[in-house]
Amino acid sequence: MYSRDLSKNIPIIQNYANQVQGLLNRYSDLASGKIELNFIEPEPYSDDEDYVNRYGVQGFPIDQEGSKVYFGLIASNTTDDIETVPFFDPSKAGTLEKQLTDIVYKLNRSKKPMIGFLSWVDTTPPMMPNNQLGQGEYTILEELSYFYDFEFLDTDVESFEGIDLLIVYHPSDISDKTEYAVEQFILNGGKSVIFVDPFFEKNDHSNKSSNLENVLKTLNINYNSNVILDGAQATRLQTQQNITDNTSLQTMLKLNWPEVRGQFINQAEEIGDGLSLIRLVSPGGLSPLNDESEISYTPIMSSSEVTMDLPMKEVHDPIKLINNFQPTGISYDFGVRLSGIAKSNFNDFEFKNDNHLEISSKNINVVVFSDADFIRNAFWARIQKFLDTNVIEATSDNGSLVTNVFDSMTGYDEFIDLRNKEAPFRPFVVVQ
């Protein structure tokens, strides 16, 4: 729906409307009759205006008389599922194709993949009116819930029936039985994403460090559980300093907060393709445990060689870190993808299952990150209000990285490039 006459004197809206309409027409042409378009121009106090308001499309006031421009979308499928764009924001033109493709994909997908979320931190999104995003600390999970079903699991779970993708988040106090269940799920072909962290910096969380020692050995991962300092990728923070009653801004290096960029993000791996900045918070270090393993180890993002590792208790004073920084020349990985044949590290476990697997039944598919903080809003998202709707402004690619992982692991990888590259004009390929 679009108020064409009222927007004639608003070039930015008019131009973007032409772009949106052109893209919708292109989608319809490619769909061979499976997408039907109806363009509505709501008049004040009309049935059309009541209809669009009922589904959340909002008018944008343009004068003191209360005239409103409508510029939104209501999409539905044959089972009456509804997706709505309250108002097309011209400042988001670079991601229009991704926005529309997400809607088409969601309405066309018969069943959402089930995400099993095994977390030692409260990541459950709050229940908000009108599905408002951005009220919790893990907005990325709120976003992903539009495309995936989530089951938040108890930390003492011992089986993962019906789970398409298992997330293990900051396992700070995992039992042997649960860790064994995670390993056997992976060896049996289950897909998993693991977040471990040497120093989880959330103030109200008592268990600061996490590990998954036995599973990581199964995955042929050597995990340095010290905090990795990176002198070449340190975050630069602006701080205020008072000197004789004059306040000045000073730049301070936060060595334990790497900003991973450029050559340190693997563009050849589809999860990292197109990403330009990942902000990490006191990460650990990953490397292969045994070079003779049958597991394929692919870095997603890495440190420089200007690094030093320190125990968690020694990284609280940023000035002290700078003064005592002595690079070792060792490079670490912060995120890796693993595939191939894995062998159990629980063959002598007292509580083995009757159908215990000593070797994986097929190639494993696992992603491991050595930081858990980076998916929290504070390190990638700024929440703003637009027409009474919370809008997420990304300040780094952390959210895209997490979404890429989910999409790649569950078969939605055809659309990863739409998220990572702001290119409104590109050749179209029909995805079967």
Give the positions of each predicted feature.
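Short linear loop/turn motifs
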Residues: 65-70, 226-236, 421-423
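Acidic, S/T/G-rich, low-cysteine, solvent-exposed domains in lumenal/extracellular/periplasmic regions
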Residues: 109, 126-414
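Alpha-helix boundary/capping detector
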Residues: 50, 63, 241-243, 428-431
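Generic structural motif
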Residues: 4, 42, 78-80, 90, ...
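Juxtamembrane amphipathic/hinge helix adjacent to a transmembrane helix
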Residues: 403-431
